[in-house]
Amino acid sequence: MVTPREDWLKLTEEETLEPELPICDPHHHLWDRPDNRYILEDLLGDTNSGHNIARTVFVEASSEYRRSGPDELKPLGETEYVHKNSGLQGNTDIIAGIVGHVDFTLGERIGEVLDMHIEAAGGKFRGIRHASARDDDSSIPAYRKPPRGLLSDAKFREGFAQLQPRGLSYDAWLFHPQILELNGLAKAFPDTPIILDHIGGPLGIGPYAGKRDEIFPMWQADMATLAENPNVVVKVGGCGMVTYGFDWHKQERPPTSQQLAERTAPYYMWCIEKFGPDRCMFESNFPVDKASYSYNVMWNAFKRMSKDFSTSERASLFHDTAARVYRLI
């Protein structure tokens, strides 16, 4: 992951568009790493940069784990840490919802661990992300290094089945060749809400570099198939990740919101067309996407590309879908 450069980001600064429009940012992280810090004060620096961020949702990032005890309980440390950093900051409900991590391959007994997360989050626990993103090519970075076919694994599904009785959702992080694997999971658990992170991970590096024209229609077809499942919603964002191959981080200056909107609209508009605004939510994915553009410019881009939607459709995209799916209001 590329570390964000604040001095570089300042080379492209813009006036905030429609600063009154309420936004729920449904995907950000917190971590304190030697080479890449993003703690509460950094998050607040972004959420206070001009847009009306009404509330946010934290998504697990393997940070602040417990250093001792059983492995399956170590992620509880992240939930505990994040809960301590949550609360009202000005007009923003920071971390109104928490998406944590458990290892579903532990099967049915993971239910007890889910109950511990729910208790540790003080009423803010909303779901689990157990990432399945992987590729056979070693040049593609894999978060958690999951095995092939994880979403079809019997033990994984045994653990996954513990979500619905607790009213919890599942955040899916995968790459575009795996979208149809999620389709199978969604059909097997039609009553469990599934949130697909970052538009399904259309890769643009390694063996996928320079093949955007070939990959895009394949991604479109698989996303259209996935959209047939009413329990699946999509986080619209994530194209600032280096793995998507847009290479904004290599430019002399960061992109403007107009440039960003033009480059990403084919992906984002396809998701909205197939899933509908009531099953799509704009996201920041900060600080990961911060390698490519600033928080203010990013939300300006979302506002530009959605300007032709109705007031109610835009309310869904910027706030209401996320607030409903994560049960924030």
Residue ranges of predicted features:
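Histidine-centered catalytic micro-motifs
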Residues: 22-33, 196-199
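Short, well-ordered coil/turn segments that N-cap beta-strands
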Residues: 19-22, 51-55, 91-97, 122-126, ...
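Alpha-helical scaffold segments that flank or form the walls of functional sites
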Residues: 33-93
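Catalytic metal-binding/acid-base residues of hydrolase active sites
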Residues: 29, 62, 103, 133, ...
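Active-site gating/metal-coordination segments in enzymes
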Residues: 2-11, 70-178, 184-187, 200, ...
